[in-house]
């Protein structure tokens, strides 16, 4: 007997993505322009994903702002990091505000490896321990680069009631973060920062950065969030992304060509990354237990407090197992 994924609605009882047809404009889907977005681009190229794909290099914190925005920067859907979405949703609940979106899908099942980096010429920073009491660069408040240093601090035993383990400085995108740790005649703006390992590796190889450690997320790394979980276009979007994932798995050479042709990755790095990542065959729905575990860890790390609530306020489409006897 095998199991397959079935989707039920969160707030309206038994509900899946609607299968009704709608004559609406294209979905606006924000993605972080890294290698993880490859199946989504393949879905648009080969399977008719009817969406405008909008790159957002500032990370998940910026994605949450786009989901809330009603202006030209607004999006209908965002694909981003679990910790960024959960932290933002929890903080909105703690503040008594509506986040303006909910979690509707799970994109990547494997954890994310965050590289911990400093400038290659920084003789004062040689290990993770050297960051205690220092200044950590982040892309944006609420992004994974902001959340994960606190998870690291918890693991390292740096958290205390009276003193922050480090200070944080909002720097901006990946290029700005790299510049912030370089020592070029003046005191660097930051002592270290965290970014996905394979995105960072090119800059170890070219001598710009120095790797001082790494940390894995203790949860599946990427989720899908939607401004309106009842949007009828989400059903076809999910089906198209599922097709894109299948195509990625069946055509690895095309995936490698996309990664190396549009991003700073060597063929060897792309191949190595592909061995480490597992995309879900069906992106629809989120396991509430995964979200509750993430909330628990973020509370322990001091990112969230008891007012943040749990999955019942965050998961808009649940993912459940159902026996399949066929």
Say what each PLM segment does.
Residues 37, 64, 85, 128, ...:
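Extracytoplasmic/secreted envelope proteins and their assembly/folding machinery
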Residues 82, 173-261:
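Pocket-lining segment of extracytoplasmic ligand-binding domains
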Residues 231-305:
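Secondary-structure end/capping motifs
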Residues 299-326:
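Conserved C-terminal helix/tail region of periplasmic/extracytoplasmic solute-binding proteins
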Residues 1-22:
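N-terminal mitochondrial targeting presequence
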Residues 70-73, 91, 184, 188, ...:
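Generic structural signal for alpha-helix termini and adjacent loop/cap motifs
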Residues 153-154, 204, 260, 299:
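Residue-level preference for well-ordered alpha-helical positions
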Residues 23-169, 191-197, 211-212:
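Short, glycine-/small- and polar/acidic-enriched structural segments
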